[in-house]
């Protein structure tokens, strides 16, 4: 299994026979090198989105049309994109599981907000979500944009994720200290990868507080387009 950061909250996850593009905001992303777009997209099988905000949906429609990839996510957002943009999609909801190229993807709770920009103001696009992604003997908890929440308790106990990809840049999500607290209290991760940080000055620029708060856990600060082997 390989997890490759695309900057901000974007990832490329190669697991089982699937290559998932998670929240692919590439165009205009200060951390993503535009001349390496093809490298990021090569072999992708699905686009997995956590919510409607532009720094997460980003290039979703463009990639879906260009590559003929299905967009996977919360029913409201996916069906709206299907009707508006004519793309393929797999819409489901909290507690539901879909199998993508052999990987089992279960939608779980997050606490944030979800909308897209419209001419008359924000357009509601369903609720925000996280995912448990199971395959190759591992379970990844992809938090999506969220703060700490009590639901993490049963989510950790039921799904038993060993890898956490946690939005932890603060301001819009939990910060590194809160993410460390959540990981200690609710999960038993072997590996934690922070995201939604370093993109803008108002977000945290380092994961040192996360590392300090998780002794004994491998905290990997991702580098853009450098694969992490799990």
UniProtKB/Swiss-Prot annotation:
Gene3D superfamilies membership: Ribonuclease Z/Hydroxyacylglutathione hydrolase-like (3.60.15.10)
Q: Which Pfam families does the UniProt entry name for this protein? A: Lactamase_B_2 (PF12706)
* GO MF annotation, one: hydrolase activity
Task: Please give the InterPro entries that the UniProt record associates with this protein.
Answer: Metallo-B-lactamas, RibonucZ/Hydroxyglut_hydro, UPF0173, UPF0173_UPF0282_UlaG_hydrolase
- Give the keywords, sorted: Hydrolase
Q: State the NCBIfam families in the record.
A: PRK00685.1
What is stated as this protein's family in its record? Belongs to the UPF0173 family.
Its recorded name reads UPF0173 metal-dependent hydrolase RHOS4_08540
User: What organism is recorded for this protein?
Assistant: Cereibacter sphaeroides (strain ATCC 17023 / DSM 158 / JCM 6121 / CCUG 31486 / LMG 2827 / NBRC 12203 / NCIMB 8253 / ATH 2.4.1.) (Rhodobacter sphaeroides)
């Amino acid at each position: 299994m390989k997890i490759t950061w695309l900057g901000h909250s974007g990832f490329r996850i190669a697991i089982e026979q699937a290559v998932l593009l998670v929240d692919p905001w590439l165009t205009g992303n200060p951390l993503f090198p535009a001349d390496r777009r093809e490298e990021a997209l090569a072999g992708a099988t699905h686009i997995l989105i956590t919510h409607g905000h532009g720094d997460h949906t980003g290039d979703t429609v463009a990639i879906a049309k260009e590559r003929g990839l299905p967009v996977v996510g919360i029913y409201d957002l996916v069906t709206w994109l299907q009707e508006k943009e004519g793309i393929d999609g797999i819409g489901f909801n909290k507690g539901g599981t879909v199998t993508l190229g052999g990987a089992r993807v279960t939608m779980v709770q997050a606490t944030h907000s979800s909308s897209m920009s419209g001419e008359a103001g924000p357009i509601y696009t369903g609720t925000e979500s996280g995912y448990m992604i199971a395959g190759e003997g591992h379970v990844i908890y992809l938090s999506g944009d969220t703060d700490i929440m009590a639901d993490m308790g049963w989510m950790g106990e039921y799904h038993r994720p060993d890898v956490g990809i946690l939005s932890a840049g603060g301001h819009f999500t939990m910060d590194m200290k809160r993410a460390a607290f959540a990981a200690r209290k609710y999960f038993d991760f072997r590996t934690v990868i922070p995201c939604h940080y370093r993109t803008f000055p108002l977000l945290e620029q380092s994961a040192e507080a996360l590392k300090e708060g998780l002794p004994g856990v491998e905290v990997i600060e991702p580098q853009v387009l450098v694969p992490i082997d799990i």
